[in-house]
């Protein structure tokens, strides 16, 4: 099985989950592309190239997912514009610095973010039924969260989306469904900025990036459509499991390579 075919399959699965759960897809795409190619006769894809591909997926998947979630009234424009720009600025810095980081350091950062996000997503949440346009967030909390997660997202290529959702729900008290939709818009800012940094430091493979982009066009809107028919608590539980599994696998690889 060629790397191109593996990338296409991984891109479809990741983009579906991106639209469904608001995670940007990188949490699924990263383990797929790191471990599957050698197992099925393909060529191992370098870690830095994989992180570049997750950013491409995040841009296409997040853009389409945001539009679909917005049509359902699940995107807070106020949150997106409050947290998106600072996240983008920090993501550029993280993407440039990632060029000089060892692969296992990048994987460790990925695993820490994923573990923290998955644990937060298991915490009980107070049900809220508030329209997206009425959502308010304290800038003194929202902007620092965006800066920190944007920076680390620029390093590892996933935009810190899973942790952004957890922060929106448990720190800023945003209803889960709106947190999922808004996180895609916030992540889009960071992903575009991080792509600039990754491309400038030769961490993008154009043919594989094109495959990931096309896969997102197909699968992300389908995931978003399924999301609105799923209970918010169930979405958070599914997201937590996906994030935890990815974190465990990545952490084992990082420890073995250190």
Residues covered by each model-derived region:
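Short, contiguous, pocket-lining structural segments
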Residues: 156, 160, 184
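Membrane-embedded alpha-helical segments of transport systems
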Residues: 53-63, 89-90, 186-193
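Short hydrophobic/aromatic, small-residue-rich stretches within specific transmembrane helices
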Residues: 54-58, 84, 183-187, 208-209, ...
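Hydrophobic/aromatic end-of-helix segments at the C-terminal termini of transmembrane alpha-helices
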Residues: 29, 160-164
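Juxtamembrane transmembrane-helix boundary motif
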Residues: 1-24, 28-49, 64-155, 170-171, ...
